[in-house]
Amino acid sequence: MDKIERVPEYTAVITQEILERYDGVVRVWDTPRSAIDGGQVVDKITQPTEVLVSEEEKDIYGSLPQRAKVRYGGGKEGWVLYQMLAKMG
C-alpha cells in the first residue's frame, strides 16, 4: 500500500552533482510509480533546477520518503525519486 503524505511545502534542488550521478537526466513521472507499474515519464530535467515539494511517498513502513511530488519551471508538476533531491535550508 502506498503511503502518500502531504507535507508543508519546502524547496529542494536538483544539483549538477545529482545530474552527473544519474547520466545528466532526472525523469519526472505522472504518478509515484515505475514504468513497470504503469507510470509514465512526463518530463526530463537536464539542468540544475529548484523545485517545490508538496507530497512525499513513504516506504512500506511509512517512515522514509521514496518519491516526492514537485512543482517547477512555471507550473510543471510530477513525481521524482527522493534521492534525486537536495533539500535547501
Predicted regions mapped to residue ranges:
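SH3-family beta-barrel domains
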Residues: 1-34, 38-47, 54-57, 61-64, ...
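Hydrophobic/aromatic side chains embedded in well-ordered alpha-helices
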Residues: 51-53, 75
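A short macromolecule-binding patch
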Residues: 74-84
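Short strand-coil-strand connectors
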Residues: 73-74, 89
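SH3/SH3-like beta-barrel fold
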Residues: 68-72
